[in-house]
Amino acid sequence: MPKKLLLALSISILSVFSLNAQTVVGKYAGEFMALGVGGRALGMGGAFVAIANDVTAGYYNPAGLANLNYPQISLMHSEQFGNLVNYDYGAVAIPFGADLSFGISIMRLGVDGIPDTREALVDPSGTVVYDITDPRNRINPSLITEFSNQDWAFYLTFAKRHTDNFYWGANVKIIRRDIAEYSATGIGFDIGALYSPLDNLYLGANVQDVTTTLVAWNTGRNELVSPTLKIGAAYRIVEILGGYIMPAVDFDVRFENRRFASYGSLGPVSFDAHAGFEYNYNNLFSVRAGYNDVKQFTVGAGVKLPKLNLDYSFARFSESEIERLPDSHRISLILTLEEPRFMRDIF
């Protein structure tokens, strides 16, 4: 069986069977929101909590939207696992007054064309049956239909400049999940902060799903997305080879009992890390590299044009070529409406 079809069938089987279980679970319930956004940040291994100085801050650290002096728009598209999974992202942010910013971000993760064999098993007489243990029963290809699995997340972001070196912000998240005839909705909250204690040193923190996010399925099943604490630091080293280099590191603390799936764990608490750097030459182009929380090596590059930033990132798992999943390529753009009439009001 082709690898793509096998993966699609696995997703559908696991999803459908899990939806019928009337239990409350928390592990990996919000994993689709952990994929990261933006070619710039992803090229740095996702180490962006302390940087977060563009429109993608609505995802990485809501406080970072306070950095904006002009409105920004961002778009990203990615096809993962051999083009089986489509991942799209879009965001808009605007500065307001002297110290506020507002934004909206949308993420969609989708698998289309999943074979649905639930009504395709027939007995020797051609009657649809559901007994998979009877070796005489066979799949009738003409009865196989298709369905989609879609996960959506909508972020509404508020950010404020509290002082010149301290910003804070918050997200309201609305979640929508669909698989075949099943659907779920949820709402959650994030809070974040940015602090620069010294010139060129940046510290950040973001508590995702701070109140624990409830995702309720129409089957009666409820999933809880546990809080995740993300903390990070970045330092900008200026005047190197005509530009600057900025190393960054993030640490994720989760409370989902992930154990061996993480870099380290202590009881139900798990720890993951992101590390990366960016070299920017004269604010014209950038090169990046990093290592993320799912053990992928990442590289990337970016070009700054008038009012437009184009960024690309590449990620590869560290396993051997035979064992690892396909590579990921992501391209994103950021449009900055850098005109006097759109500039933040400075009183």
Label each PLM-derived region with a short phrase.
Residues M1-L9:
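Bacterial N-terminal signal peptides that target proteins for export
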Residues A8-V16:
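Bacterial N-terminal signal peptides
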Residues F17-A21:
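Sec/Tat signal peptide C-region and signal peptidase I cleavage site
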Residues Q22-F347:
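Subset of outer-membrane beta-barrel
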